[in-house]
Amino acid sequence: TGYSPVLIVEELGWGVEKNATWTGIATWAGLGGSIGGGFLADRVGPRRMALLAGCGLALSYLVFADARGLWRSDSFIVGMMVAEAFLSGVLFVSIFALCMQVSWPLVAATQFTAYMALLNLSRTLGQGLTVEVADLVTFQGAYVVAAGLQLLPLPLLAIIDPHQAR
């Protein structure tokens, strides 16, 4: 979440270098999630994979919020970084695959670009809002809110018919 760097560096005292190192290492898990998620999306469908990854990400946020006693454990924080990166990779590639499926072939490049721009806009707005609500929520509360926001759009996956656009 947008709170992670503040929590890890300022509250848990990791330091910028240590946080950057482990965040960089966790990025490899995101790459693995993207590659593996692509294969799985081809096998079970991008809607189902997006739903599973979104639920997994929300669950990981709830577990993290509930396990405050483990926050001082470097292994727990690194595990959370890896899990978040991996599940985010699976989620994003599944959403990308779904966006490609629902794009109308005649204007697919333009339509897909618009979908990607909206996904990037939502991430940017989310990061920006983090600063605005920082004083209103505890770190634990932020992760609970993140879990709720992660689950909020998932029911929309049920009404998307990838074959309707074609």
Per-range role (PLM):
Residues G89-W104:
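Intracellular juxtamembrane helix-capping segments at the cytosolic ends
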Residues A146-R166:
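Multi-pass alpha-helical transporter architecture, strongest
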